[in-house]
Amino acid sequence: MSWSLLELIRNNPDSLMESLRKRNVNPQLAEKAVELDKKWRAILQEVEKLRHEHNVVSSQIPRLSPEERKKKIEEARNLLSIIEAKEKELKTIEEERDNILRTLPNVVHESVPVGPDDSYNVPIKVWGKFRVYEKDVNEFLSQVKGLNPDYEIIKFKPVGHADELEAVLKLGNTAKAGEVAGSRFYYLFEDVAWLEQALIAYALDVITSKGYSLVIPPYMLRGEVIQSVIDLDTFKDAIYKIEGEDLYLIATAEHPIAALYFKEEIEAERLPLRYVGLSPAFRKEAGAANKDLKGIFRVHQFNKVEQFIFSLPEDSWKFHEELLGNAEQIFQGLELPYRVVNIASGDLGACAAKKYDLEVWMPAQAKFREMVSCSNCTDWQAFRMKIRFVDRKKNRKGFVHTLNSTAVATTRAITAILENNQLEDGSVVIPKVLRPYLERFQRAPKDYITPRKKS
């Protein structure tokens, strides 16, 4: 049964070591796994030879005299004892080898730029007309080198989303949320709350129109499952655990959707399976103590629409591009200008073989901010969750590939709208594509969100 990491340690260990070096991961554990696998295969050959000997001895027994039969029966028993001991040794070595391999990150795809951190990420395309404050033009151009962006210079610098939300529009309150829930929580009111609902409806409309099945997943997962979906040792400070329970709050709908076929086989003709999930996302953000302290860009709880695909291994790279294309369609509809970035090897999460980020230009901050993360996890999650495909026509089995992408993370999309669609009087233009989802509600805003007195 194919599994990319196991195939590499057997057939091309140098390639695996190179992948680990690209991620700045010490290859020592992988080298141990290579040695364990060599030992495992050598013992397996011994076992197969012993089984053959046992079969030969057993086949001779019926034709022997009673005295000779007794000797052969004893010989067969001794062989079985040796086989049993060797099989136990095999299982122990196999478990040790696989446990090591489970700690390793996915194999980096050849098209991923090599570098230790996000400064090596490579912008590969831009879309839209960028609004750039006159004093930020050089900074903007430095972030889109070689991509020939279309941009207009504006004379006023938009207010940052945090101040726009709370001081100008007066439709958010992070101070009171901080008092009652802690930092990085928020209240959203009226027009901005309606805007969030429209974003969700719009994203679901776009993705389900492409044949993706809508799912509302569990908001918690058991420890065994979450450890299979993510590298829990690395991310244990990023996700919330329920005290006294073997349950974790999900950080994205990706995780429970990935677990939809936990320890199951999927008929090959059913693949690909496309899903779009709607859920809250809960994140500790422990590693971001001093980042984005104001506003709603980086918060502990937000709503998110997530795309997910289970595919055959040979098809996963085309579906990676499909997921990115879907996300681009959503942000093009919102008319939010963005760049797509190919994430560097040192900035990839353990699950992903390759990842794109879609980053929207934020004119008040004079920088691009991540809105979408789009990953091909190949068989990294599927092996850990034991999700296999069965192709009866071609008489083959293997592990499926899993892919995921944000469709929209509502709070981040709201921050992008507040900065990009802001007028000099503080009003915010509602994207035209969202207006049909607001028209049906009497109290919802229709064309603009305008500053108001705090109630």
From Swiss-Prot:
Enzyme Commission number(s) of this protein: 6.1.1.11
Top EC group: ligase
Major site of localization recorded for this protein: cytoplasm
Amino acids binding ATP: 283-285, 299, 370-373
Alphabetized GO MF terms: ATP binding; serine-tRNA ligase activity
Domain of life: Archaea
Pathway membership: Aminoacyl-tRNA biosynthesis; selenocysteinyl-tRNA(Sec) biosynthesis; L-seryl-tRNA(Sec) from L-serine and tRNA(Sec): step 1/1
Domain notes per entry: Consists of two distinct domains, a catalytic core and a N-terminal extension that is involved in tRNA binding.
UniProt-listed PANTHER family: SERYL-TRNA SYNTHETASE
Functional note: Catalyzes the attachment of serine to tRNA(Ser). Is also able to aminoacylate tRNA(Sec) with serine, to form the misacylated tRNA L-seryl-tRNA(Sec), which will be further converted into selenocysteinyl-tRNA(Sec).
Protein name: Serine--tRNA ligase
Species for this entry: Metallosphaera sedula (strain ATCC 51363 / DSM 5348 / JCM 9185 / NBRC 15509 / TH2)
